[in-house]
Amino acid sequence: SVSRTASGVSRMTIMFCSFGKQPLIMRLYGRARVVHPRDDSWASLLELFPADIGARQIFRLSLELVQTSCGYAVPRYELKGERPTLASWAEKKGPEGIEQYWREKNTVSLDGKPTGLFEAID
């Protein structure tokens, strides 16, 4: 998963919902490790995803449990398409502008913890 921020190895849950005709919820539970652009494995992992100039983190999830449930309460929605706004904003900023934005906005989490985006967290 590419993050469009977290640090270290910690618990993570990813939830998938079916918004179509067949209801279903699937949850993946595990421990996640964050890979940043400064890490050796960044380039090889990034190749696994569509190009995204704004990609700042990849989460490597070691699965511990997979569960499904009925999803009967999940509403039905029709996807109209992706919004171009974020990609357009990132293209206009360019790599240097995005890095500056990350340094201003993404080095500390909402609860005041360092994200490790530019330097390793011990």
What is the meaning of each model-derived region?
Residues S1-D122:
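Binding-site signature for planar aromatic cofactors or substrates
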